[in-house]
Design a protein with these regions (language model features):
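Active-site phosphate/ATP/adenylate-binding loop shared across adenylate-forming ligases
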Residues: 1-3
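Amphipathic alpha-helical "lid/sensor" segments that cap RecA-like P-loop NTPase cores
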Residues: 5-49
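Accessory nucleic acid-recognition modules appended to NTPase machines
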Residues: 33-160
Length: 160
């Protein structure tokens, strides 16, 4: 049986911030737990540059990589919410088809996951929209401009 022992996480924080918040802010990518706080933002800047310039190019032909980058940031703001592709596209000046395709690219590259809605009523379960989530909480924090665990605990997305 697993036990929740806060002492197991104490080595990651200085005690001023709840340890879970620090872990959520850093995310789960390899090497980040030992990285100094001041380098986390640089890590994710490089990660996003590599993701967009190399990984996305190999998955799909996207003519405007800057617009796709804005799409990813907007998608991060919608984490834990129902996604309306029409509104998402309209906010960026792209059509619904492109918004759906780009969302699928984020899913195919393991940045984004859709979780079907749950309801005890099977009809409502089928008719309800799924919610989307960024897979890595550290990347989500970076994309939302959350640059410290202290900022995270007061952010509207905290706890969702």
């Amino acid at each position: 049986m697993l036990q929740n022992n806060e002492d197991d996480f104490s080595k990651f924080g200085d005690g001023s911030v709840p340890p879970l918040s620090r872990l959520m802010w850093r995310g789960g990518m390899p090497g980040l737990l030992d990285m100094p706080d001041q380098l986390i933002s640089d890590f994710f800047t490089g990660y996003m540059r590599t993701y967009i310039e190399r990984d996305v190019r190999s998955i799909a032909e996207i003519s405007n990589l800057n617009l796709f980058s804005r799409f990813v940031r907007l998608l991060s703001a919608l984490s834990a919410q129902e996604i309306n592709s029409n509104e998402l596209g309209r906010d960026l000046g792209i059509d619904r088809t492109t918004a759906v395709r780009w969302e699928n690219i984020c899913e195919a590259s393991y940045q984004w996951i859709k979780i079907p809605s749950f309801n005890k009523n099977p009809i409502k379960r089928i008719s309800s929209k799924s919610k989307g989530y960024f897979v890595d909480t550290g990347l989500l924090c970076y994309l939302q401009g959350i640059f410290s665990p202290e900022i995270l605990v007061s952010h509207p997305l905290y706890g969702h």
